[in-house]
Amino acid sequence: MSIKFRTVITTAGAAKLAAATAPGRRKVGITTMAVGDGGGKLPVPDAGQTGLIHEVWRHALNKISQDKRNSNYIIAELVIPPEVGGFWMRELGLYDDAGTLIAVANMAESYKPALAEGSGRWQTCRMVIIVSSVASVELTIDTTTVMATQDYVDDKIAEHEQSRRHPDASLTAKGFTQLSSATNSTSETLAATPKAVKAAYDLANGKYTAQDATTARKGLVQLSSATNSTSETLAATPKAVKTVMDETNKKAPLNSPALTGTPTTPTARQGTNNTQIANTAFVMAAIAALVDSSPDALNTLNELAAALGNDPNFATTMTNALAGKQPKDATLTALAGLATAADRFPYFTGNDVASLATLTKVGRDILAKSTVAAVIEYLGLQETVNRAGNAVQKNGDTLSGGLTFENDSILAWIRNTDWAKIGFKNDADGDTDSYMWFETGDNGNEYFKWRSRQSTTTKDLMTLKWDALNILVNAVINGCFGVGTTNALGGSSIVLGDNDTGFKQNGDGILDVYANSQRVFRFQNGVAIAFKNIQAGDSKKFSLSSSNTSTKNITFNLWGASTRPVVAELGDEAGWHFYSQRNTDNSVIFAVNGQMQPSNWGNFDSRYVKDVRLGTRVVQLMARGGRYEKAGHTITGLRIIGEVDGDDEAIFRPIQKYINGTWYNVAQV
């Protein structure tokens, strides 16, 4: 059976490995392995490769080591985690730290699923390369990326079992320890043998003759639960300690005691002034002495309380009573200082200053009236009041009827040098030049603003300045619209400068573009339609046109995907014709859905092989030790005579290729 799977050291890899064997040269650092799908089929490794046919994933090596049984074998290991997948694996490649492909191999086809596909697994890939000198290869990798495989763990466990690399035991960790039969050792690193344990047990099993304990030495002691003993040879039991604590807990603390019941304290003598606690007897005696010292003052207080009816709210009662009294004021004094006389009327000339004025008959008549209406009638002002009731007030008012201006009247608002005016121009009846005008002036800053107010919200609708009209809300024009000229297109259209050049709506969802009354473009239902040629450039032009005679519509589409970033494709309703595609490696391919038929085949004939054949037969005699085939030839026969050395014939024929009308012998590597 022929060998189907193999590993090949590339030409570049062999050169690097050979150079690394020279003294003082840097070792080859193999750091990375890549996997590929071979472009969809099992590839054959080639020493001339500089990369995989179609790489799908690469990562740093998990392990690189020298084979234990074959000293010139180097084993490289790659681990693919479960979350990586979704591809076929048919080829492997080893790369050094400079990115050079050192070795390439094919492998049995295997699909690596991704977790998102519902299945996942760890997968280990190994490549074995044979080198003439292992010393030329760096066998260390970044340990932060290493993951232990099952084989690695098994090897390390077996190696550890055969080694003596185990820690010694200590008081905090397990480990190896040395035995000892000593019974008086203070070591904390030796372990006692059964012999030492037995000796200690036999000693402990004998009679104990220890002495009693005293206040000066350790020893045996007897327990006691007594709480009033003065012994210095007995030891208190927990019961005795609890009894004492229970009694202690019944006592009040020295600092801020919380007393209950009716505690008593000694009565201090009268006149004592310190921090001693005062009992009720001391307080009552002090109060009695105070009363006896000033009997007249207490009697006065008793009499005052009786006079007030023993009112406990005396202060509130007095405040309420004073609240209704007239405060003392200079106003009454000012009025009281006036001299009374007939036909005199008092009035104030200043703060708390009064004077008298002469009261006339009219004044007496007005004062005699009981209503405002009577005063108005007396003064003859009724007509004036009637007119004022329907007048527009100077400080602002609301008109309930119409307001009419005659002739060329102007309604103006003026402040300093700024103004706003509304006027009407009409020279005579029947005048054809009648109009209403609006004028503002503010040193060139004037403009007209039309605004609307709803509730508390104000919104600007339009502004008109000296050089621009700005409409701030949606505007509806029922008819055609012309910019700089009248509109000749009619309907719902806009013309720009030229009366028949612009845009026109010619139906639901249809917008046409006109130039000199000629329809040149249409936008309809998401489609742009050109009724004339589409031209790019003004001197050397690129033109796109249609004669409208094709049986199918043509589509030129630019699209892309993750595996095909850029595709420029031409096709019709039946399928695609050709496309140009940029790949993920930035290369470009051109594909035709059919046969290419150039008018001149010369370019193809000069570049491609049209036929292959075996050329004229060549015969060579074989000498002892063998003979290699000629360059570019293959052996087609042998003629073995066997009588003498050098009379056997080897028949060769050259391998020839036919290019552009000429047969060429193939070259040999």
Swiss-Prot record:
Name this protein carries in UniProt: Probable tail fiber protein
Subcellular location as annotated: Virion
Keywords tagged on the record: Host-virus interaction, Late protein, Viral attachment to host cell, Viral tail fiber protein, Viral tail protein, Virion, Virus entry into host cell
The organism's taxonomic lineage, starting at the top: Viruses, Duplodnaviria, Heunggongvirae, Uroviricota, Caudoviricetes
Keyword Magnesium tagged: no
Family assignment from sequence similarity: Belongs to the tail fiber family.
GO CC field: virus tail, fiber
Spans annotated as Disordered: 251-272
Disulfide bonds: none
GO biological-process terms attached to the record: symbiont entry into host cell; virion attachment to host cell
Entry annotated with the keyword Cytoplasm: no
